[in-house]
Amino acid sequence: MPNISRKPPPRFYSPSHSPSPSLYAPIQSPPAPSYDYHANPRTLNPFSDAREVGGYAQLQGEDQMTGAPLYQPPYAPQLLVAQPTPVSSRLPFFEAALARARGIQTPSLPEAPTPAYAQPLPSYLPPPDPNHPDLSVGLTQANTVRYAINPRSQLKEGSRSPSPFMDDSFVYNDAAHLYNVEPDVEKALLGSGLGYESEKRVESSMGFNDNDGDLSVPQSFGGRPPSWEPSGILDEKGEMSTTKHFGPAPAGRVGRRAHNAAGYRRIKQSATLDENGFFAIEMNIPTRLAQFLPIKGVEEQKTTRYTAITTDPDDVPAAGFRLRQNMTSPPRQTELFIVITMYNENAELFCRTLYGVMKNIAHLCGRKNSRVWGKDGWQKVVVCIVADGRKAVNPRVLDCLAALGVYQEGAMTNTVKDRPVTAHVFEYTTSFALDGDLHFKYPDKGIVPCQIIFCMKEKNAKKINSHRWFFNAFAPLLSPNVCILLDVGTQPAPKSIYHLWKAFDVNSNVGGACGEIATFKGKTWRSLLNPLVAAQAFEYKMSNILDKPLESLFGYCTVLPGAFSAYRWIALQNNGDGRTGPLASYFAGEQLNTGKADTFTGNITWQKIESCVSKSAKPKANWVLKFVKAAVGETDCPDTIPEFIAQRRRWLNGSFFAAVYALMHTNQIWRSDHSFARKSALMLESVYNFLNLIFSWFALANFYIFFVILTSALEGSAFNVPHIDVLNTIARYGYLGALVGCFIFAMGNRPQGSPWKYKAAIYFFALLTTYMLVAAVLCTVQAIKNINSPIFAKMVVSLISTYGIYVISSFLALDPWHIFTCFIQYVLFSPITDLLLLKLISMFHDLSWGTKGSDATQASDLGAVSGVGKHVEVELVTAQQDIDIAYQDALDNIRLRGSKVDSAESEPKKEQSEQAQKDTYANFRTNVSIAIMLVQKKRDDAKS
């Protein structure tokens, strides 16, 4: 629509009518009577016979007041030369006040009005919204005072002139004019509707004199103090405020500003629940995102569907909830259903995982000769992102989802007809991606559409509950062939998902599979400079070379890592009674929160142990578990000792109780439909797991015995090392003292609260390991000299069985690079297993999933859906302008990478402060306990 000018033209007099001497003098006469709008319609046509001049309707012919003849020049009106005034209104307010105080006479410049024409909006600007005015022009000299003082007066054109000398608005009675003739590029870009060398017209107010209380207009030109309230802003004490030019100062902390002063406004509107009572709404995507869509008109890419779920995840399918894939005609067949679980991980880790998944989908679409995949293969893959708690999600992750078009905060609500919302579900098919560096990737880079379901739980109910939403709420609606589990931070290689799916496709007996977990090394493998990361990289690689292939050969993997694993959907189904089976036994671990589960049941559910056993030993089935080496997933491993200990403590709890549970239920293998050879192989694997459990239990004592034997060998006459016995005695007592200290640390101190205690113990064990390796090398050299002695054979066998197997197997697997980059770090950190074992034993009672808490209260910051029946009222952010503003804010936050956030986001929470206080008390208790033990030890030595 055209941008209509709102300023009336100036009053022009005919030369034949002799003006009075007071015409060019300052006008002191009272204001003219009000103009009757209905009797004299206004027009913007400069060639019309009737024109509004100064609040009167004048015809070409005679003056309505004096009867004098008038004429109006069509293009070159006569210029009016104004006389000097005491204070010019063209000065900014503060300079005008200063000039008035000093008594300075400032001349007024002549006014050169030109006819006003309606200026169309620029083509690059969106169409105006009548409900959301354009607030791009800020508060200025003229309109600020009117905002603050006279609510009855009209809002005249505000000045944005950069000149400190004069203002470019000139007020004459009730008509305001712009007299500048120089092009103002700033006004043109801001959409003020001004053309070069043109004038913008302002309509007069409805019978009010707009100069009443306008401090920007001098009294000689009709301006005067307000007759009904003081010219200024009164503060709380009733005194004049000094901020009347800019408005009152905001109270309290000012949050992050939006692009528009309107912010994200929720507008109350009526809505209709669906036939099953769910509140679902289709939200338009941002305008900027719609402009870059590769294919226009696709409904699933034009809108984002939001649904507020108020039921338990187990009751979602029975309640009649449907996804977009169920609404198509015909319903889409889902081959792969991928879940990405997250808590509070940062945006880089999230985008790295999602980008890896989208590259895998692009690879599936590129397999043109496949009977399953091809050009439209993306329609057979659905990605489900489950966030554990709305308040716990990283805000930058939500910005990334909003940038992709998946998430819109303005659509969410807290309750639906007094029923609390348990999960917010967003559905959208995005055509773009964000890589790990938060850079957009478009379809020209190989990105294909991706169907995304974003389920954000209202409360933090831990990871096992996130899997329950995936398996019990969404998977039954899609009935996928294969379900893939991913954690945020694990990036699958471009072909990994295909290789995982292929393992199920070529062998119908495969019920579960896992890929190779590798550490994320970064560019040029710079992460390996951290010895802790290098040690984990070596451990992961050796597990994928030795352990996983052996277990896959037998047909049963003790643990399928939740970070990167896949399951056949029909293999996960429970038994006929519905109370037993893989999923039922797995989700029994959620009873930990209700106090209905014992310690043993709580620990075995950590690593999905029962799920693995139930699939392999499922009655009347012959499912096997496979390891797929070609499917590689890079995970972000812990790079600090506190994070490493917290993670491995959970893993050790799961693996330890996994072995115990598997051994206790070995007889269930004979109830399955496996062949006799397969059952025999599984029994042999059970024996292997039993021996491995025994060695793990005695690993602490075995390491100490090995240390004592090697260091004591240096005391022999063959080495002739002076005073080596003193050094060995100190090392042994230090070893035992460190073990006792680790027991105390493990039982009373968190790794996050006492990092230096754990670091000191680990570094001391690494020093003792170095001493032990030196002793082993010296003993080996001495044994080589006596090659015919029995000790040589024992030494060679022991070294080959421990370290030689790593080197030989790595070269046989044609993957030896970790031997050259990570072997030394792994050997030095090998004693950390002692600390982890002590931590495991000391924390058997702790069934929490790390440091992640849970919410207990229902929030009420999003509004509510209220009404009777299916017709309800709800407050939503549905205006396109506000949606575009929110989208631009998300893009800005991604670009800033979270460098500028609200201070409240960085403030420590109350729970964190309380935990820090508890850690301080625990450190004091541990220090006192260690001091008492040392004093008691010295006292016993003195007595002896």
From Swiss-Prot:
Q: Where is the composition biased (Low complexity)?
A: 13-22
Induction conditions: Induced by high temperature. Repressed by the antifungal agent caspofungin.
Region Disordered: what ranges?
1-49, 901-920
Instruction: Give the Enzyme Commission number.
Output: 2.4.1.16
The record describes its membrane topology as: Multi-pass membrane protein
So where does this one cross the membrane? 690-710, 726-746, 761-781, 791-813, 827-847
What keywords sit in the KW lines? Cell membrane, Cell wall biogenesis/degradation, Glycoprotein, Glycosyltransferase, Membrane, Transferase, Transmembrane, Transmembrane helix
Q: Which InterPro entries match?
A: Chitin_synth (IPR004835), Chitin_synth_fun (IPR004834), Chitin_synth_N (IPR013616), Glyco_trans_2-like (IPR001173), Nucleotide-diphossugar_trans (IPR029044)
| GO CC field | cell septum; plasma membrane
The Swiss-Prot or TrEMBL record describes its family as follows:
Belongs to the chitin synthase family.
Supply the source organism for this entry. Answer: Cryptococcus neoformans var. grubii serotype A (strain H99 / ATCC 208821 / CBS 10515 / FGSC 9487) (Filobasidiella neoformans var. grubii)
Where does the signal sequence lie? none
Protein name in UniProt: Chitin synthase 6
Compositionally biased intervals (Basic and acidic residues): 901-917
The domain of life for this entry's organism is Eukaryota
What GO biological process terms does the UniProt entry carry, in alphabetical order? cell wall organization; chitin biosynthetic process
Where are the annotated glycans?
3, 326, 603, 653, 927
General function of this protein: Polymerizes chitin, a structural polymer of the cell wall and septum, by transferring the sugar moiety of UDP-GlcNAc to the non-reducing end of the growing chitin polymer.
> Null mutant: what phenotype?
Abnormal capsular morphology: lower fiber density, abnormal fiber distribution, decreases capsular diameter. Decreases extracellular vesicle secretion. Sensitive to high temperature.
**What's a Pfam family in this record?**
Chitin_synth_1
Presence of keyword Ligase: no
